[in-house]
A protein has these predicted regions:
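Acidic/histidine-rich alpha-helical segments that form the ligand environment
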Residues: 1-2, 51-102
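Generic signature of intrinsically disordered, low-complexity segments enriched in small/polar residues
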Residues: 15, 99-102, 122
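Carboxylate-rich helix-loop segments that flank metal/cofactor sites and access channels
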Residues: 30-67, 71, 126-133
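Short, hydrophobic secondary-structure boundary micro-motifs
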Residues: 40-41, 95, 122-123
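Glycine-rich, aromatic-bearing surface loops/beta-hairpins
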Residues: 108-109, 118-132
Length: 133
């Protein structure tokens, strides 16, 4: 978040953290507490910094941030699918199904934003010549 210069990407990340990630964390904390599982220690939150405070050579650019978040969302989709497939408790499986849906929606939103900003470069089209057939 501290490295983001694009306002649309910053809004997306804030919404992703506030609406999706924090709600997932709270739901999982509640599930663990109900089942008597001790919560692991969490690191302290990082302070908010201005992008101007970060030296230009140390900044992560918006394209890299969007790609990393997209990769994280894709990994989250796979993880949620694995939990749903292996889960014996229906309530936990449904919970991860909800997480899966939120991650899929966030992925589509990020893809649209990335296309709009020109951050997604489509690969060259493969044209088959009649000589190659």
């Amino acid at each position: 978040m501290n490295h983001t210069g694009d306002e649309d990407l910053k809004k997306f990340l804030e919404g992703l953290i506030e609406n999706d990630m924090n709600s997932e964390i709270e739901e999982l904390k509640a599930l663990l507490k109900v089942n008597g599982v001790a919560l692991p220690p969490a690191p302290p939150e990082r302070p908010v910094a201005s992008i101007e405070d970060i030296p230009p050579g140390a900044r992560i650019n918006d394209v890299e941030i969007a790609a990393a978040v997209s990769t994280g969302l894709a990994a989250g989709l796979v993880t949620c699918s694995q939990v749903m497939g292996k889960c014996l408790r229906e309530d936990v499986g449904m919970l991860f199904g909800q997480f899966h849906m939120k991650k899929a929606q966030a992925g589509v939103t990020l893809l649209r934003l990335s296309k709009k900003k020109g951050w997604v470069v489509p690969p060259p089209l493969h044209v088959r010549n009649s000589d190659q057939a």
